[in-house]
């Protein structure tokens, strides 16, 4: 392996190339727009931020700029030409020595470069274009096709020109520049692919460590997953667009069938996978940014090491050459691994394309079935419309009948409420009648007791009369004896006469009291008889009224039951229901009250 002094001589260290890939879109309307870079331009050169103070002046002097002429004209004019720079020979093949006397050669190649419609500055990047998702060469849009590169100068050897197959994004067989270019992102194009391979080669070539190489391999694995998702998203977007294009306007809204449901499920799955694809793309862009920063930082550090003091330069050059040899070997292995992964991805892409074709055939068969079922569906819809009209008419009639039934039911409920009220009143009257009957019984018992008391008083009065008569007879006898005694001689018992008179007065007073009590009792008894007779008349009248109301309520209930039976049978659906709530008048004299 030769020394790396050629990297220091001249400005070849900064002469990084910009290789654009030609992308031709098959159907721009069938593809979805993905995220682009913010500037939409090719990145050119490395960042020249100096990490060490002593090498800053040298870095400023060794900077080199490449200008690319960009001519933006209207469509249909001649294609502007500008020179494309390539660093294909910068690293050489794995195992070939570097030549310190000869600088690396630039490989010119003609290709199409997609340019933004707003900016003309072009900068290279350290990434290589990836495979198109359709498995074939993508075609550029009409706007991007107007910008082309200048053809190679005639003095350059033809062996160094790149073949057109490189425009398809395939990796080189020799392993050189496997990760040195990136497809440009144009703001005017409708679809672009994200870069796939991270910048591992140049980083390892300028003294990269095994840790950095391992990080590059990890980034490559994640980018391979991103390419798989991109390839499946292409088929999904095409299928989704074919579903949208096959839809046609229809005058009658057809119900969703199971086939359309399956189509919608497939479209939903495709949309979910596209969302996962966008997430993978965002993560890939973050990793790409980190790798690009590491890629730009590594050459600067290598240059600072190479531009150090002279005594240490030889050892560092040897170490750098050994590291570059190891890096070239690792890169060769990585290229082989990437080629193997590329073949696997192509196989997966073919399987996905087959699956897409199968889904498209299923979709076409579903569409044919849909068109074949169209006339029968229209006939059934017409019949359904007729039946719906009949159903609406029947519903209207049913509503009218329901309103009538509701009115009758409300009337019946009102009558039931009235019946309940009258029954409550009757129960109250019955309770009142029972109370009056109980009071009447108690009065009768009291009357019997009073009669018995009156009879007893009468008996006592008779006894007192008899006693008074006996006492009067004795008094007369005593008076007669006293008169005889006066006539015959002095009185024998003059002290007994006042006592007998007092006793006589007392007995007379008691007799008067007894007579007064008897008169009062007889007048009370007479008053009680009159009150009892009045109460009896009232009770009899109330019983007659109660029986009359019972009979009227019974007749009304009979009529209501007949009306309910008629409503239940539906005989008088169109005839108005007449209910006589007053009832027939019963003569009051015909009611016979029960005896108390």
From Swiss-Prot:
Keywords: Cell cycle, Cell membrane, Cell projection, Coiled coil, Cytoplasm, Lipoprotein, Membrane, Myristate, Phosphoprotein, Synapse, Tumor suppressor. Residues 136-193, 295-324 are annotated as: Disordered. A lipid is attached at residue 2 (N-myristoyl glycine). Residues 178-190 have a biased composition (Low complexity). GO terms for biological process: negative regulation of macroautophagy; regulation of dendrite morphogenesis; regulation of postsynapse assembly; regulation of synaptic plasticity. Residues 256-374 form a coiled coil. Pfam families: Fez1 (PF06818). Binds EEF1G, TLK2 and CDK1. Involved in the regulation of cell growth. May stabilize the active CDC2-cyclin B1 complex and thereby contribute to the regulation of the cell cycle and the prevention of uncontrolled cell proliferation. May act as a tumor suppressor. Defects in LZTS1 are found in many types of tumors. It is linked to Esophageal cancer: A malignancy of the esophagus. The most common types are esophageal squamous cell carcinoma and adenocarcinoma. Cancer of the esophagus remains a devastating disease because it is usually not detected until it has progressed to an advanced incurable stage. This is Leucine zipper putative tumor suppressor 1. The gene is LZTS1.
